[in-house]
Amino acid sequence: MGVASSKILENLMEGTNFDKEEIERLRKRFMKLDKDGSGTIDKNEFLTIPGISSNPLAARLMDVFDEDGNGTIDFQEFIMGLSAFSGKTSKLDKLKFAFKIYDIDRDGYIGNGELFIVMKMMVGKNLQDEELQQIVDKTMMEADEDGDGRLNFHEFKNAVDSKSVASALTLNMI
């Protein structure tokens, strides 16, 4: 392993909850997912991950993993994104990842429209838009502690702070 590669590995180990062996296994998994050998995973390749293709939030997951917004996921983004799903990841870090799912425009806040869009992805056609909007409005009213019409991370955390969120954000990829 070259100096650059070992520095990347070191950074990944520091920035995630994965050890060297887990990162190596995930690298092999990444290479299998990268069907065209481009060194990145595109949306179609991402959707072949078990548990992702059937997830109603698959498109949002892709966007959150794709930190630089270029439409593909490189190995570092893959590892960083998967780290949120590790059983070793703290509840706080899992909540930060969940917050990113809702924060579509990446401005550090969840607005009414963003909450509606993500919840619509989850409920699909099971609720009429009017019913869903009522739920979104009620959620925003209850969670928006400072009354600015949007949720910051602290408000989001307080609204969803429960063991079920952390356990729901655990995925066995290794």
UniProtKB/Swiss-Prot annotation:
Gene Ontology biological process: regulation of cell morphogenesis
Alphabetical UniProt keywords: Calcium, Metal-binding, Repeat
PROSITE patterns, per database record: EF_HAND_1 (PS00018), EF_HAND_2 (PS50222)
GO molecular function: calcium ion binding; phosphatase activator activity
Segments forming domain EF-hand: 21-56, 60-88, 90-125, 131-166
Ligand binding (Ca(2+) 4): 144, 146, 148, 150, 155
InterPro entries on file: EF-hand-dom_pair, EF_Hand_1_Ca_BS, EF_hand_dom
Residues annotated to bind Ca(2+) 1: 34, 36, 38, 40, 45
Pfam family name, one: EF-hand_7
SUPFAM superfamilies: EF-hand
Record's function text: Regulatory subunit of calcineurin, a calcium-dependent, calmodulin stimulated protein phosphatase. Confers calcium sensitivity.
Listed PANTHER family: PROTEIN PHOSPATASE 3 REGULATORY SUBUNIT B ALPHA ISOFORM TYPE 1
Further facts: This protein has four functional calcium-binding sites.
Complex and partners: Composed of a catalytic subunit (A) and a regulatory subunit (B).
Name assigned to this protein: Calcineurin subunit B
Source organism (scientific name): Debaryomyces hansenii (strain ATCC 36239 / CBS 767 / BCRC 21394 / JCM 1990 / NBRC 0083 / IGC 2968) (Yeast)
